[in-house]
Amino acid sequence: MKKNIFKSGGFQSLLASLLCIVLGLFLGYLVLLLINPAGAGEAILTVIKNFMTYNRPASQLKYFGNTLVKTAPLLMCALAILFAYKVGLFNIGAAGQYCAGVALSLYAALGLGWGWLPCMLLAICGGAILGSISGLLKSYCNVNEVISGIMLNWIVLYLTNMLLTTVKEDASPYTKVLAHINESAVLPSLGLGALFNNNQYVGLAIPLSVLMAILVWVVLEKTKFGYELKATGYNKNAAKYCGMAEKRNVILSLMISGALAGMGAAMLYLTGYEQWQCSTSSVPAMGFNGIAAAFLGGLNPIGTVLASFFIQHITAGGAYVDKSMYCAQISDLISALIIYLCGFVLFMKHAMNSYAAKREEKAALKARAAEAQARAEAGKGGDQ
């Protein structure tokens, strides 16, 4: 029997993601038309082009590097969401775990003078501990991980502000410049910066994040541990009756998820690309954007690499829109539309499954009708 391409999981994920992207860009274009029709076409092209807006190849390379620098932490947050989701958990607390990674890595670098490796390990441990708290509450107190995650997000945000106030600049609310205070805490460039017009921020974080995506795929798809995690996600009771430690799996999955988010924070702030604003009153969007990247990537670690780059590419491209025609927030609006539509990826996959099932049912009915007709004609021929 010919295989229906609409039943292929890979094809469904790819098509659903492409539909979300096209629809998001189209809605963004409509918004631009409503605000100022004269510059809508040029504005949406600017968003898509991002660093290609620059005419000089050297500038294009440099700002392409900046996009990759911001893609690495987004990818790590997406992997954090994906890992927990495979166990049937929705780790909305990834934003707080990311905050914990920021706080511990920057304090260790600026306040304690540690090198980049112990700073990153401390960020990983901070995210893991925070994730394990949600896991313990879920396993032993039946507290929904979404509720505990949201509460912890705000607690950790204000703890981060309090801790990093001790290492901020005197005349501004931002933390001190990492390269000026402790150069040993800056992630090594591995010579990659030279490939992007001597971009000082491009370095270890980019290849390391891709390696982590491959590692997550191997763990989930090729190991006994990954099989047990997914089995727990499909049916917790069935996993328990099969001898699997379902409570342990829940705790470990959220712990690993938190570790990935914390590592993502270190990948950004230990490059020196950004400084933390100690007066911030909102949780970083990186953790929430990771949700969109995970779903846009079809909940596949390898697909998430491309999805993370696309979301960051569009977000960065919005900054180049002509501010004389559109307000500064228009780039965030366009990015938000695309990110919002990423939530419909699973809905689109369900619609494609329904369509494929109906097509198969019609084909089966036609085959049975043709078979019945052939038998009837054969019977008539025998009677003659």
Regions found by a protein language model. Name each.
Residues 260-261, 270-336:
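Transmembrane alpha-helical segments in multi-pass inner-membrane proteins
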Residues 32-37, 53-111, 124, 128-143, ...:
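Single transmembrane alpha-helix segments in multi-pass membrane proteins
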Residues 1-21, 234, 241, 245-248, ...:
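Cytosolic-side transmembrane-helix boundaries in multi-pass membrane proteins
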Residues 4-15, 85-92, 111-116, 120-182, ...:
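Short loop segments and helix-boundary regions at transmembrane helix junctions
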Residues 50, 57, 145, 153-222, ...:
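Transmembrane helix-bundle core of multi-pass membrane transporters
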Residues 2-76:
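Membrane-interfacial amphipathic/re-entrant helices at transmembrane-helix boundaries
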Residues 71-82, 97-103, 125-132, 154, ...:
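Hydrophobic alpha-helical segments embedded in the membrane of multi-pass proteins
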Residues 129, 196-276, 302:
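Helix-loop-helix "hairpin" substructures at the membrane interface of multi-pass membrane proteins
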